[in-house]
């Protein structure tokens, strides 16, 4: 190759690099636009379907308790491990069908009212009962003045008072049903306003635009400390507001709630989606984070709607 051709090739390469630089990097596409949305208003039970029969029974017992209008104690027919406990809690927190906005915290308690360390994940079946605290905004002031009292062996010494706190929420079946309908109405309204004949790719873009224009990332919740959770009942209820599908009412949420909103909208138009959770690095520290896994045009994509909400960019 002669000198002129080498110089010409160099110039063309440089021009190409400059074009890429000036135009910015190419945005990854979500789907190809081949499948139409179905507006089926169906959901999926991705997390629930992976539970074994014992875990499903406990999950259903918790749901039934809350739907009756209160929290309280559930005595387990057979002890479960923290591994099983975590699977149940994750289902009630993130499953598109079984996610329950009304649950704030579920306390694992063992023999002699010992609070089991939920962060030690193992197969030891030492959880004998669960205490369910519902998300009751009307009675949160009481939680500011209540503390679980633990002795040196992690035994809850004020268990009767704690059970009363769980059972005495200003909650009712009617309130649960009314707020559930109010939450559903928000999602229905968004879908009702969608242009007709959208394909899956366009629908996802539409939902992300809605999140960008309407949702606000709640930094105040993210920056507040919620650990140790048994000592921060009030803070955990506020945290729950921003991390379940009900956060659509106040248009404020954090990664969990925003991811649930996107997956909920997608499922209602026939796009299979569910929240997934892991960790990301922030200033060198690993922190929890949520995304959405979805099937668009027969391929799986992982979308971070929180990034859209925080930056206003896709």
Locate the predicted segments by residue.
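N-terminal Sec-pathway targeting helices
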Residues: 1-12
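Hydrophobic alpha-helical membrane-insertion segments, chiefly the h-region
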Residues: 14-23
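Intrinsically disordered, low-complexity N-terminal segments that are enriched in acidic
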Residues: 24-163
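Acidic/histidine-rich, surface-exposed loop or edge segments in extracytoplasmic proteins
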Residues: 39-44, 66-71, 163-173, 181-193
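A short, highly charged nucleic-acid-interacting micro-segment common to nuclease
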Residues: 244-258
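Hydrophobic/aromatic-rich core segments of domains that either
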Residues: 256-314
